[in-house]
């Protein structure tokens, strides 16, 4: 699909950057010669807009061997960022998709500045081409055919091999994020814990990874009482899924991802209202993020060791479901007083974290749609983060900044630990109250990470969007897929 050339050679459409400057860039000046100065006129009359995300279409009318030019407004160069570029290109690729363009090119060097080099631009372009044109996978009987871009050419004077490599990496990042989106959007009667495990096994086999899927009896033998408690009310069997990627000869410095895989959450006996229950098919967004990251890792083969662990079940009501006031024993041996059955994700993750450590994880990152509290605190754009190790957190933060997936650190103080340890009947309680809900959930998980360097990512606000946006339609976003993969790719770098 991707090609690199030094000159244009006939395309349906070409994308060109347009910055807000006193004069036209050299790229536009050269093209304007073929248009006999008409582009300058269009700029002066503001029919070619330089505003951020503005897309202006100009037909060549036979003046060049390209049918149409799409000028992408990027605003002032001093305010140009990777986020600006992602948003603008997302809109540009959507425009091409709507026009049913199958052969497009991009004047890559027109997007390059002192802040962003050609490698950065190529990576983002290929990534966003997938993200921006993602279509919801629906179950409608009348499905519309979608015309997809078949050929994309980067026009640049830079080294072709380096640009091709950047395009490939960006494409893989975008595709894997879309894989996660599709998982999150699937209805809960289709995506059960069993189906999620089957998907994970297929992924592992495709990329020659080791894997384990623990069944209920094996979980009982290992004492995974926290996950099993959440599963008590369900007719669907639970699964503890593990994918193991060995990128080094020695099994050292193992990065462990733990993704919450609650395929549907009614709240259990602490029942959600109808409004709060609709959409809970997405409560396995953490699992999807982890699997998306493993898809990227499988494709790009970084020299790192990585474990992905997914505790999976649904949380439903029945005569056998677990109840408030129950006391359960986790795999770690720590006992937990259940005060809220709707705080089930942290119970499943507790056993997932302990199991990841058992498999050899030296570093832990858990990802979960864990609390409504994080949405109240940070909104729908920023992922909440907590940690027991600032060095590991800084690496996660840098990866999130590189991928434009913002995170914000929330605290863990001793008094927070005291609240989750406050139980007359057990070592811990799973829900100390509404105050500081996001912090309480993360603090609870920290009790199981213990001394292992750990970062918690609460994607409850960022996993899905209610409306269409520059990088895709309403629904799942694939939050943290690219951040996790970038963390692995950059892990340990100074």
UniProtKB/Swiss-Prot annotation:
Entry keyword annotation includes Zinc: no
Cofactor, how bound (note): Binds 2 manganese ions per subunit.
Predominant place of localization: cytoplasm
Binding site for Mn(2+) 2: 260, 265, 283, 344
Family annotation (InterPro entries): Leucine_aapep/pepB (IPR011356), Macro_dom-like (IPR043472), Peptidase_M17_C (IPR000819), Peptidase_M17_leu_NH2_pept (IPR023042), Peptidase_M17_N (IPR008283)
Leading EC class: hydrolase
Keywords for the protein's UniProt record, in alphabetical order: Aminopeptidase, Cytoplasm, Hydrolase, Manganese, Metal-binding, Protease
Entry's Gene Ontology BP terms: proteolysis
Catalytic residues of the enzyme: 272, 346
Superkingdom per UniProt: Bacteria
Catalytic activity: Release of an N-terminal amino acid, Xaa-|-Yaa-, in which Xaa is preferably Leu, but may be other amino acids including Pro although not Arg or Lys, and Yaa may be Pro. Amino acid amides and methyl esters are also readily hydrolyzed, but rates on arylamides are exceedingly low; Release of an N-terminal amino acid, preferentially leucine, but not glutamic or aspartic acids
Cellular component GO terms held in the UniProt record: cytoplasm
One Pfam family per UniProt: Peptidase_M17_N
Enzyme Commission number, as recorded: 3.4.11.1, 3.4.11.10
Listed CDD domains: Peptidase_M17 (cd00433)
Required cofactor(s): Mn(2+)
Residue numbers binding Mn(2+) 1: 265, 342, 344
Location in or out of the cell: Cytoplasm
Molecular-function annotations in GO: manganese ion binding; metalloaminopeptidase activity
Family stated for the protein in its record: Belongs to the peptidase M17 family.
PANTHER family: CYTOSOL AMINOPEPTIDASE, LEUCINE AMINOPEPTIDASE-RELATED
Its biological purpose: Presumably involved in the processing and regular turnover of intracellular proteins. Catalyzes the removal of unsubstituted N-terminal amino acids from various peptides.
NCBIfam families assigned: PRK00913.1-2, PRK00913.1-4, PRK00913.3-5
Record's protein name: Probable cytosol aminopeptidase
């Amino acid at each position: 699909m991707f090609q690199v050339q030094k000159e244009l050679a006939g395309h349906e459409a070409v994308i060109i950057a347009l910055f807000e400057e006193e004069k036209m860039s050299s790229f536009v000046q050269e093209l304007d010669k073929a248009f006999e100065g008409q582009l300058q006129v269009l700029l002066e009359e503001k029919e070619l807009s330089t505003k951020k995300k503005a897309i202006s279409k100009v037909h060549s009318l036979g003046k060049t061997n390209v049918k149409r030019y799409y000028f992408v407004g990027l605003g002032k160069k001093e305010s140009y960022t990777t986020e600006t570029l992602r948003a603008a290109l997302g809109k540009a690729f959507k425009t091409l998709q709507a026009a049913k363009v199958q052969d497009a090119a991009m004047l890559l060097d027109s997007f390059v500045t002192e802040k962003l080099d050609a490698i950065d631009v190529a990576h983002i372009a290929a990534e966003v081409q997938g993200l921006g044109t993602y279509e919801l996978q629906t179950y409608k009987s009348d499905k519309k055919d979608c015309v997809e871009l078949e050929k994309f050419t980067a026009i640049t004077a830079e080294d072709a091999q380096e640009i091709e490599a950047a395009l490939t990496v960006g494409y893989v990042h975008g595709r894997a994020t879309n894989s996660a989106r599709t998982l999150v959007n699937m209805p809960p009667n289709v995506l059960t814990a069993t189906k999620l495990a089957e998907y994970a096994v297929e992924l592992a086999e495709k990329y020659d990874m080791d894997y384990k899927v623990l069944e209920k009896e094996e979980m009982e033998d290992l004492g995974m009482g926290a996950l099993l408690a959440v599963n008590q009310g369900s007719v669907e069997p639970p699964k503890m899924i593990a994918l193991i990627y060995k990128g080094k000869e020695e099994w050292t410095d193992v990065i462990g991802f733990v993704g919450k895989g609650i395929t549907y959450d009614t709240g259990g006996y602490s029942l959600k209202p109808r409004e709060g229950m609709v959409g809970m098919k997405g409560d396995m967004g953490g699992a999807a993020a982890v699997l998306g990251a493993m898809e990227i890792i499988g494709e790009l083969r970084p020299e790192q060791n990585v474990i992905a662990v997914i505790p999976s079940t649904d949380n439903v009501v029945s005569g056998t479901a677990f109840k408030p006031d129950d006391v359960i024993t986790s795999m770690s041996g720590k006992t937990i007083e259940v005060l809220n059955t709707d705080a089930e994700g942290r119970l499943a993750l507790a056993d997932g974290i302990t199991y990841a450590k058992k498999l050899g994880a030296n570093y832990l990152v858990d990802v979960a749609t864990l609390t409504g509290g994080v949405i109240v605190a940070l909104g729908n754009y920023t992922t909440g983060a907590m940690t027991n190790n600032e060095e590991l957190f800084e690496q996660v933060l840098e990866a999130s900044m590189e991928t434009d997936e913002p995170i914000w650190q929330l605290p863990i103080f001793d008094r927070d630990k005291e609240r989750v340890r406050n139980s007359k009947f057990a070592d811990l309680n799973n829900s100390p109250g509404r105050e500081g809900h996001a912090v309480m959930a993360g603090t609870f998980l920290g009790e199981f990470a213990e001394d292992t360097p750990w970062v918690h990512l609460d994607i409850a606000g960022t996993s899905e969007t209610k409306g269409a946006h520059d990088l895709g339609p309403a629904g799942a976003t694939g939050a943290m897929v690219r951040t996790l993969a970038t963390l692995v790719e950059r892990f340990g770098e100074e």
